[in-house]
Amino acid sequence: MDAFKLLTRSTKLKSATTQSSTLPSTGKAANPQLFRGAAAEKLEKGSGKKRKRAHAADDEAVVNEDALNLDFFSQGRSSIPKSSDAATTKGSGAPAGQEGASESDSDADDEPMDEVQRRTILNAHKIKVTDMRDLEELAPAQVQSEEPKKKKKRKQQEEAEKQQPQTLSKKEQKKARRLFPQPLVSFKELRSKYKISRRLAENIAEQGFTVPTEVQLGSLPLLLGNSAVPGGSSDSTSATEPDLLVVAPTGSGKTLSFMIPVINKIVRHHHTHPEERGIFAVVVAPTKELASQIVNEGRKLALGTGVKVTLMKKGMRVVERENEDEDVLDESNSESSESESDERTPNNKNKGPVPITKSDILVSTPLQLVNALSDNKTKPLATLPLVRNLVLDEADVLLDPLFRDQTLDIWRSCTHPELRASLWSATMGSSIEDMAKTTIKERKLSLPQTKSYPLLRLVVGLKDSAIPNIKHKLVYAATEQGKLLGLRQLIHPTAATTSDVRLRPPFLIFTQTIPRAIALHSELLYDIPPEAGGSARIAVLHSDLSDTQRSDIMKGFRKGEIWILVTTDLLARGVDFRGINGVVNYDIPNSPAVYVHRVGRTGRAGREGGVAVTYYTKEDIPYVKSIANIIDVSEKLRGENGERSVQKWLLDALPDLSKKNKKELKKHGVKARQTGLKGATDEKEQRRTRISTKSGFDRRKEYNKKMMIAASQKKTQARKNGADSDSAGDDDDEDGWNGLDD
């Protein structure tokens, strides 16, 4: 019985358990866009008035129509016009005649936006497109067009002309690099304006995609090749697909953004070159779970288009080598024993008779693809001459020291002169951007026939920041036991105050290491009552498990059979669980970027109500400030004036972390929780950070029992060894030297 309810039954206080029904698990968000508000409507009205003054009354109808299209993005407009909504949601269910009529109407209505409209939409959705090429490569006319048009005296104009060839200021450089390409207003434009495959457009509609997210709004027109990208001259209107760096929030639809252009490009290539078959696109992801997810999403989009999407697996052949069949025959002839031939039978099937993988899009992790190209590093790296698109998902991890060499080897193996590279992530530092520019330049020098394309960067929102549609909580727990009690309080909430954090399953729990994940799983194994499913509702996932076990756990979590999943940073990136209500950082992340990706597992596609809880102890205090800063920026971006989870006094009190300690934290995590520590003080730290609620007395009893069993086994083994040595000694005495014979 709740005493608070009993004592307040005659009052009109609101129940503390009443929560808004908006949770990520309740369903799809009405609008998946993260950045939308009243500011967009004001800018759109201003642009409409500008067009009215510029044009005569005959353009008034066009202005009103454009205003309606722009109002499509505003928050005040709760719904899309019924005609467009019906056409979008029905998708392929509409008859062919009606679809063709709607397409012809949309062709007639599609008109290119002027720069004011493009700027309005892109700024309202916090989309920034920048040309990353050197200033020497940019058109001088572009620089001049960005200068403010003001009346100047002749002397000032002459001075400005003299200073023009010299180095520009930072502000002028930013203006020269800034671009405002045509945005994607709705997914219907993919078919009407950008002429994508009819079947691909139907598949997109069947998936229920109606409103493009910010990253789709900005990147799809660029990658589909129908948006004019500045080239070498100001009058160049030839549309070209650029190399692209994309920094967009987690759960914003980056997979769809790079899969649609790749599939459409391959469909066109199949029509123009039906005899040419092979791997035309390579998608690289850091984990098997993310690679498998990309394959599933790609197959949904490519259904019925003739494009095959394949997941790279061990033993697959992706290239054909010279004299490969002869090598296999020599190996088979050199073995003669029956047992060895029986063991070699599956290997022969994989090496000799197995044909080259017939796929258009290959999705792989870096190591598997490098091993396939180099025959497990026994031969020189083979080339992929037909690959025209290279996609690096979670590019900041792929170009980190852990995967950097393998990723660059894959990049160099793609030798097609028209190769386009696109890098995607929610966090991307300047070092990653510089590495991408350097790699593109080196590839151009090593392959003279390589064509040069613009290198653009698209940033959505604030760079390297957490999504604003989730609630962040930073909780001080003092000790490991305090964190465990706080976690159990989340699973079994009993408090009646409205300020308490409430988290409904399903949710993820992140730990620093695999042993800690296993220990936490065993500690929470029986916290869920049998009536609710018991221990089957909680699972642990880490890289030490087999591929089959990992796949089964992922399926169970997606189906809703598993409610709580304890894991490491294996699931921190890219994996899309759309119904997760929250994330618990049981151990603080190793870097701010890891925090952004961890909490991004909830609040996918604009879903509201997600919660991110981070526990920290006394040992974590030196490392918490960077996380607190991210939470503070995210809450400011959200724009609410309520109580903040990170107060100003806390930000001022937390210590700053040096660069050396940041690198150490990123590599090894918090020292107190590292595995394999040696020394008396380190052992003491490990005992302090142990995940357990057992008392020291119980642990000592268990330890003594284990030692007694080990000592007994040792004695038994010693007795056996002694008996064997005695019998061996007797035999030696019988066979030994018995003296000289008489």
Curated annotation (Swiss-Prot):
Biological process (GO), any one = maturation of SSU-rRNA
Where does this protein have compositionally biased stretches of type Acidic residues? 102-113, 322-341, 727-742
* UniProt record similarity statement: Belongs to the DEAD box helicase family. DDX52/ROK1 subfamily.
Gene Ontology cellular-component terms listed: nucleolus
Subcellular location as annotated: Nucleus, Nucleolus
Origin organism is: Emericella nidulans (strain FGSC A4 / ATCC 38163 / CBS 112.46 / NRRL 194 / M139)
Residue spans making up a coiled coil are none
Give me the reactions it catalyses.
ATP + H2O = ADP + phosphate + H(+)
Q: List the disulfide bonds.
A: none
User: Where do the annotations place ATP binding?
Assistant: 248-255
Q: Which CDD domains match?
A: DEADc_DDX52 (cd17957), SF2_C_DEAD (cd18787)
Protein name listed in UniProt: ATP-dependent RNA helicase rok1
Residue ranges of every copy of the Helicase C-terminal domain listed in the record: 486-654
- Domain notes for this protein: The Q motif is unique to and characteristic of the DEAD box family of RNA helicases and controls ATP binding and hydrolysis.
Q: Where is this motif: Q motif?
A: 189-217
Keyword Transport recorded: no
This entry's Enzyme Commission designation comes to 3.6.4.13
Renumbered to this chain, region (Disordered) spans 1-113, 138-177, 320-357, 662-742
Kindly state the positions of the motif DEAD box in this protein. 393-396
